[in-house]
Every structure is written in C-alpha cells, then in structure tokens.
Design a protein with these regions (language model features):
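TPR/TPR-like (Sel1-like) alpha-helical repeat modules
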Residues: 265, 272, 277-279, 286-290, ...
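Cross-kingdom TIR/SEFIR domain
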Residues: 15-84
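C-terminal interaction surface of TIR/SEFIR-family domains
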Residues: 55-129
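Solenoid-like repeat scaffolds
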Residues: 149-157, 184-192, 223-229, 270-274, ...
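An anion/phosphate-binding loop that grips the pyrophosphate of nucleotide cofactors and donors
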Residues: 8
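Amphipathic alpha-helical repeat scaffolds of TPR domains
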Residues: 117-139, 143-146, 153-169, 189-208, ...
Length: 393
C-alpha cells in the first residue's frame, strides 16, 4: 500500500467513512507527493475539520447507493479532475507542500520504482486469473485457484498481497483445506503480522471444524485481540465460533449451550460497539437477543434494534441490490415483529438469490435457531411461514 501511495501518478482517496486507516494513508500521500491527490466524499455536511479546506469531489448517496444520475455526474467530475491533475502535476494540492516551500517530499530510487511496477503488473495478472476462476464450479474452480497458489511458491513479505487474494478466493470457493494449508505454509512471523491472514485462517478453521479446529480458531482470534482492541470483523468471527457451538449443543446440553449463547452475544455486542456502521455483528446480536428471550435480553434488543436498522438502512435496506443487506433487513424485521416489512424483504431476497439458493439456506439457519428457541417476542405462525418460503427457494 505504501509503495502505491508513493508511486501512483494519481491517488483517489474517498473519505465518506471516517476510517482512521484512510486518513493515515492520505497523510502519507500528502507528505510524499506535492500534487495529484484527489479527495472524494459522499458524506453529508462537508469534510472533517482537518481537511475541510481541501478541494474535494462531492457526490450524493441515496439509501446508501449512487443513483444512475449521481454516478454519471460523479464519473464526469472525476474524469475532469484526473485529467487536470495529470496536466498540472506541478501544482501542489498537499497542505504540507503548500505550507513549506521547497519541501523535498520522498523520491524513491528508479530501480526500486521499476521493481514495484513489475510486482504491480504481476499482481494484476494474478487477480485476472483468480477472477477467471470465479466463473468455474466445484473442483475445477478450486484447481484453478490452486494453480495460482502453486505459482506463488514460497511466501515472502513481497508476496503477502497476492497470497491474501488467493486466500480470499479459496474462502469464496469453500476450499477450506486449501486455505488453511496456504496459511500454514507462510513463515510464522509473516502470518502473525497480518490481521487479514489471521481472520481468514480463523474463519476457515471454524467452518472446517475438524478435531481441535475451533479451539485453534479461538486461539488465533485471542492473539489478535491481545495485540489490539478487537475490530468489528475479529469480534464477529469470535462470536461466530460460540454461535456455532451453541447451535450444536442446544439439544444435547442446554446448560452448556446457554453459556455459548451468552459468549456469542457478548462478542457480537463488542463487534457492533467497535463500529456501529458495521451491520453484520449488530444483526446477529439482535437475532441472538431474541433467541435468548429473557427480560434483560429483550430490553437490550429494543435499545439496539433502531441503531442496527439505521446501519442497514444507510446501505439501502430492502432496496439494496446486495443480498446480504436485504437479508439483514429481513432478520431485523423479524426481530422487531414487523412482518409486512419481512414479507417484502423476503420477496426481494428470493429474486436476488435466484442463481445462488445457498444464500437463502444460510439465512434460514438463523431462523431455525429462532424457531427452536420459541421466544415469546416472535410470532411463531409468521416465523414458520417465512421459513417455508425460504425452503422453497
């Protein structure tokens, strides 16, 4: 990432979401290059204080998405700004270069620039091969990804970015054994240093669930938490392990299952509090609070539900074209006993998942847990009806 920030002819930085990493990287770019940095934002109310005076391209979001009209206007404005930036690359847009005349910036040696460009070209080719693998199915898809994996050879620091792309491709293909094998092939120091690698590793261990896989997943996630406050993603992965244990033990050992349920709730709560804009842990928190069904849990559900509904609504709610956003709005409607909204969401989900029915089955798993718990806050007749509709695909 730093190489790209230092060497890219033009950098487009979107600050719609107040992400600390993005602002840090914007600062790196401004310290290194005098010009050709373009800021974009879909935030209402202007830019944050420290960059409020900088020139930015504003665009309008409607229900968390760009309308065709807004997208066309944004594309035109961005094309003009990129052209201007390239034509007038000597004009400083960095506040640091504007403040200190003659500030030298950072100039990398020419041979290093050539090496970086070669690596960037190789990364582009790897991503094209992985994208081509996505259209394949079953063993053919996994083998296409494995071919890229084998071509990587021994994983060094310079190979981390393409290795993460391969890991993500394995995850999307459901090739858990291959994902785990690639992580375990990495040098231990490199593996420990990457949060993303460890998150993908824990995800795969939990889903594979062979032998002590889940205990190992917990250890991996605990090591991440020990290094830094848990992110929404890390907390959500931890919660998922306990949620799966809850689902597997609720019939045979209800007392043990109750303990797993409370730990899952705690981790989903921590994930949502870490970043209330991330709807995934919030939706699961609401569903598990409804499954708990106790007075305290239902009181927390009533407090939490509006915030999670808002987070999902920012991304379009049931009007979204993303299945998981609509499915989240669906689950929240059920948790809030809003059956008319749940019915509308379900209709849209079925159209979005028409070529991938496994998505509907995944959503049904949460509702099956809800039905088994039979919480007093959820209407059982309506719940049974939506489960039948999900099963129909």
């Amino acid at each position: 990432m730093f190489e790209r920030l230092l060497l890219a002819e033009v950098a487009v930085v979107d600050v719609t979401i107040d992400n600390a990493n993005v602002f840090y990287e914007l600062g790196v770019r401004h310290a290194a290059r005098p010009g050709t940095t373009i800021i974009t934002s879909g935030k209402d109310g202007g830019l944050p204080f420290d960059i409020a005076m900088l020139r930015a391209i504003q665009y309008r979001l409607t229900d968390g998405a760009l309308s065709p009209e807004s997208a066309a206007a944004f594309t035109e404005a961005l094309a003009v700004r990129v052209g201007d930036a390239l034509a007038r690359s000597d004009v400083a847009d960095s506040p640091l270069f504007q403040l200190i005349p003659g500030f030298p910036g950072i100039a990398l040696p020419r041979d290093y620039q050539s090496t970086f460009r070669d690596r960037a070209d190789e990364l582009r080719r790897i991503r094209e091969r992985l994208e081509a693998a996505r259209i394949l199915e079953g063993a053919a898809r996994t083998e296409a990804i494995a071919t890229v994996d084998r071509d990587l050879g021994a994983i060094g620091a310079d190979d981390l970015e393409p290795a993460i792309d391969v890991l993500a491709a394995y995850r999307d293909a459901g090739a858990l054994d291959e994902l785990i094998a690639l992580v375990e092939r990495m040098p231990p120091g490199l593996r420990r240093a990457s949060v993303t690698v460890n998150q993908l590793y824990a995800f795969a261990l939990n889903r594979r669930n062979t032998g002590t896989d889940r205990d190992h997943a917990i250890s991996v996630l605990e090591a991440l938490v020990a290094k830094e406050s848990p992110s929404s993603e890390t907390a959500g992965l931890m919660a998922r392990v306990f949620k799966d244990w809850f689902a597997e033990t609720r019939s045979a050992d209800p007392f043990l299952a109750s303990g797993y349920l409370q730990q899952a709730i705690e981790w989903y709560r921590r994930g949502f509090l870490a970043d209330p804009r991330e709807y995934y842990p919030g939706v699961n928190l609401c569903t598990l609070l409804a499954i708990d069904g106790g007075d305290e849990a239902l009181a927390e559900l009533r407090r939490t539900l509006p915030a999670v509904v808002f987070a999902v609504g920012r991304l379009g709610g049931i009007a979204s074209t993303d299945y998981w956003v609509v499915a989240s709005a669906f689950e929240l409607a059920i948790a809030g006993n809003d059956w008319p909204l749940a019915t509308r969401a379900l209709s849209r989900m079925r159209t979005l998942a028409r070529t991938q029915p496994w998505m509907l089955h995944s959503t049904a798993n949460n509702l099956t847990l809800l039905r088994a718990a039979a919480p007093k806050s959820i209407d059982p007749k309506n719940l049974e009806g939506v489960l039948r509709s999900l099963a129909a695909g």
